[in-house]
Amino acid sequence: MIRQRTLKSTVKATGVGLHGGRKVNLVLRPAAPDTGIVFHRVDLDPPLDLPADPYAVCDTRMCSGLEKGGQKVGTVEHLMSALAGLGIDNLHIDVDAPEIPILDGSSGPFVFLLQSAGIEEQKAPKRFLRVKKPVEYREGDKWVRLEPYDGFRLDFSIVFNHPAIDSTSTAVSIDFATHSYVRDVARARTFGFMQDVEFMRANGLALGGSLENAIVMDEYRVLNADGLRYADEFVKHKVLDAIGDLYLCGHPLLARYSAHKSGHALNNQILRVLLEDRSAWEIVSFEREAATPPAVAHQFAPVLAAA
């Protein structure tokens, strides 16, 4: 049986919010089967619960944020991506600020944090959202599509017309039947341009951004002294974001995701298009090994092998 997962123990981290620029304390706590991923704004009185939900996504300018009752938790996508990559279904996330800390701008520190807490398989079958027919969403020359697939594959292409990005691969395919989230995706950092910083900060964004938590470029080159972590780090970060954005549906997807110039807004829209067509998806579990697609068995191999 492919089982649900949570953490073995509670783990804590402290970092800076990318957009607010203030200190943020984060606590990740185990949760019972079928709880899902639930964010808790513990700085509010009373504390506010915000479950992962594509219909709660409110602000997609520079990140994915959840909103409830006028209160928000922003920049959830890197943590959500790490949870999806490690197959964690159930978790309580306590945060004392309106956003998740950015850490190093990738999912790598979240992966380390989660693995250090230990991952526990639970006595309940993992529930997948299987795409049954193609759905698509377009805005101008940007598009995103979900199609039936016995596993989880992402094909992504980007266009930025910038020499530092154009000199790298601008398209990538990641299939978790053969690729590893931890090895191939998790370390890709968010990126931005110096000329955008003044505008963003005037709008209350990226106040905590620095070379410590993003790839930063001027008009011609990457400014980070250590360069890139992957030859295709830019497009891989877009894949990392997409994995986190899609996991807000509450279940791992069995689907092929294809996108061109997509971002948080389009990723959220394609989930809404999918969920609103009840004939386009179903919830499935794999309680018998013989019925489990090989790609799923590989991606969600027992924890000892995955960790």
Curated annotation (Swiss-Prot):
The protein's enzyme class: hydrolase
GO cellular component: membrane
Family label: Belongs to the LpxC family.
HAMAP family reported in the protein's UniProt record: LpxC
Known EC number: 3.5.1.108
Role summary: Catalyzes the hydrolysis of UDP-3-O-myristoyl-N-acetylglucosamine to form UDP-3-O-myristoylglucosamine and acetate, the committed step in lipid A biosynthesis.
Keyword Hydrolase part of the UniProt annotation: yes
Cofactor list: Zn(2+)
GO molecular function terms noted in the UniProt entry: metal ion binding; UDP-3-O-acyl-N-acetylglucosamine deacetylase activity
Active-site annotation: H264 (proton donor)
Any GO BP annotation: lipid A biosynthetic process
Gene for this chain: lpxC
Protein name, UniProt field: UDP-3-O-acyl-N-acetylglucosamine deacetylase
Pathway in which the depicted protein is active: Glycolipid biosynthesis; lipid IV(A) biosynthesis; lipid IV(A) from (3R)-3-hydroxytetradecanoyl-[acyl-carrier-protein] and UDP-N-acetyl-alpha-D-glucosamine: step 2/6
Annotated keywords: Hydrolase, Lipid A biosynthesis, Lipid biosynthesis, Lipid metabolism, Metal-binding, Zinc
Binding site for Zn(2+): H78, H237, D241
Catalytic function, reaction form: a UDP-3-O-[(3R)-3-hydroxyacyl]-N-acetyl-alpha-D-glucosamine + H2O = a UDP-3-O-[(3R)-3-hydroxyacyl]-alpha-D-glucosamine + acetate
InterPro entries: Ribosomal_Su5_D2-typ_SF, UDP-acyl_GlcNac_deAcase, UDP-acyl_GlcNac_deAcase_C, UDP-acyl_N-AcGlcN_deAcase_N
